[in-house]
Amino acid sequence: MKVLALRHSVAQVYADTQIYTHDETKDDYENAFLISNLTTHNILYLNYSVKTLQILNKSGIAAVEIQKMDELFTLIRCNFTYDYIEDIVYLHDYSYYTNNEIRTDQHWVTKTNIEDYLLPGWKLTYVGYNGSDTRGHYNFSFKCQNAATDDDAIIEYIYSNELDFQNFILKKIKERMTTSLPIARLSNRVFRDKLFKTLVSDHSKVVNVGPRNESMFTFLDHPSIKQFSNGPYLVKDTIKLKQERWLGKRLSQFDIGQYKNMLNVLTTLYQYYDMYHEKPIIYMIGSAPSYWIYDVKQYSNLKFETWDPLDTPYSDLHHKELFYISDVTKLKDNSILYVDIRTDRENMDWKTWRKIVEEQTINNLNIAYRYLSTGKAKVCCVKMTAMDLELPISAKLLHHPTTEIRSEFYLIMDIWDSKNIKRFIPKGVLYSYINNVITENVFIQQPFKLKTLRNEYVVALYALSNDFNNREDVIKLVNNQKNALITVRINNTFKDEPKVGFKDIYDWTFLPTDFETNESIITSYDGCLGMFGLSISLASKPTGNNHLFILSGTNKYFKLDQFANHMSISRRSHQIRFSESATSYSGYIFRDLSNNNFNLIGTNVENSVSGHVYNALIYYRYNYSFDLKRWIYLHSTNKASIEGGRYYEHAPIELIYACRSAREFARLQDDLTVLRYSNEIENYINKVYSITYADDPNYFIGIKFKNIPYEYDVKVPHLTFGVLNISNSMVPDVVAILKKFKSELFRMDVTTSYTYMLSDEIYVANVSGVLSTYFKLYNAFYKEQITFGQSRMFIPHITLSFSDKKVVRIDSTRLNIDFIYLRKIKGDTVFDMAE
């Protein structure tokens, strides 16, 4: 949902939009909670409170102040990510298709011939890093830029088996126009940028597990971050390959040679970062014009020095000349070298050309060896061709996508590799590598071992759920890693499947109860965003491709109502109850009936079950930003930090009742996952709360009324307001609590409206209006370790007779309290109080 805050109402009516006017009788937290549970996507928030907007944004719900009508029109028609700290709106708006254009934030693409293959009459537009060049389009009171691009489709095309780009991009645009927006993917770059800047400033050592190409720009300015990936393809790994011949295959209609060069250099750069944790000088020989340098410089102040007879406009220092092996002495330590020398074929015959290429390959290799033979802190990437070669067994092979698969590949070496054992590799084996292997990632660092790191902050986004990891080892890492942000795939199945297929892999699935964490926040993507100064207009959908975000070591853990809080917890329930169900009271009715409470009068205002916990369980797929386990734990230890709001603390027994209702719901829905989740949450409640039951009571609290509107034959009709199992020495403690609650007890609006047979020969009158105070009293006794209440649900009633009687129904009648007392069962009254 998105909340657009206005000082005045608007005349125009928008689809899927609801107006909420700030309620001055409620505080900012209560207003935020009410807004978050509205069911439309767009909320126009009138007479708004800035504090309420802050609360919503911290909860991951985008809430933006609107000053002008064009701001409202722009934000209401598309989704966006909001940096509420810097007041920047990142639109995810593809309406630019109506200008017959596709967009990119990678400058090198604009220098290709891609426009020859676009839809007729269409053009390509460069919009800058995260759409920064579009800021001039929006003259708004907040900073605004459109981060939507078609780079995802362009890159997917490059790695696909499709050659016809026009058909491919047409298909992708049609898909985008007919499917739900992949909002997490669109906002992810904004999130990653913010995340790692924050972590690097707060932690001396940061480890990142499983980065992919979409992060290749994110880490350019963070050389200190240790990366773990799937490892490199080494020269020695070619021993598994059979010999093949030249294949020759076109991968792309437009020229992607620059993309290949950029990937080669970035792969080399991240190898250098992995070894030396600082920024090097980047030397490049050949590969002009290297327009992609412009892209790199949008993210980092890396320095480039280049040699090529052709211009390289974005190099910091360009030598418009050839580079010879004697020039290696000009190259300094603390650097990387990219050797991409290859003479143009022009009109040469194949044999002459092949001879020159092989000579240049040897020359390239010699330049690399010479460069690595002296000095320190050096890594080299060199262009090679398929030919009989001796190569260091530990050197890394690269074959990033290029326009045509021919005979070229690349080799990365560091100083140690260049001096390592060399192995003869036949030309046919290298052709086999070229024909069958595409390097899919610029991060080729070693795989991560699932072991706790003592001094590091571990980030593992979408990296650990794969079933080649041991599931128990993943759980141990989450439980024991002190500082971390780790995601795992949430179990969205209805049959409690332990793993699910996704694309061409299988992932383990998890529930929050799989983890034993007492100082970690377990939330959703949008809940996590709120903790890093971001919010989002479109919450995650229960697609099956959803992840739990687990933050360990965060200073926000105790701020229960500020982050990963209960905002939107009733939203799915409202959507169902007010559109599909038998009555809008269906949730209240079901919760009472499933706990054998058949008095449904006033069930919507006096419910005996925690609606928060019930909704968090049965609708967990729709809203798991609320960290239910943390909420339970912090209340059980009395450590919850509550900033504001009319905050009701549930008695632990109310939580148990909610689990029982959720379990019944799961059985009716044949939802095995919710069934397990409910059982495990109930077990967790019993673990963190020391709940004892007065199933063998020796004292009870009684309430005698001045008026009973029914006939009765018992001596003193009364409401048993709970039973206790206490020693005689604890009586003063019980009395002290009753005195503390005196005012609230006598203020109860107690009513009755019918009689019924509670069981054989027990004739009773119903009592309404007491449950809320009962549970507050329960909490007070619990905190003093006084056993109060039974394991079965408390059903308030007044016993009228121990014989069968006819049921009577009357108009709701108020019962006036005469006095309240504490009495020993089959004994004397030890305390009483009147108003």
Swiss-Prot record:
Any one of the GO CC terms: viral nucleocapsid
InterPro entries: VP3_Rotav
GO biological process, one term: symbiont-mediated suppression of host innate immune response
UniProt GO MF annotations: GTP binding; hydrolase activity; mRNA 5'-cap (guanine-N7-)-methyltransferase activity; mRNA guanylyltransferase activity; RNA binding
Top-rank lineage group of the source organism: Viruses
Sequence similarity: Belongs to the rotavirus VP3 family.
UniProt name for this protein: Protein VP3
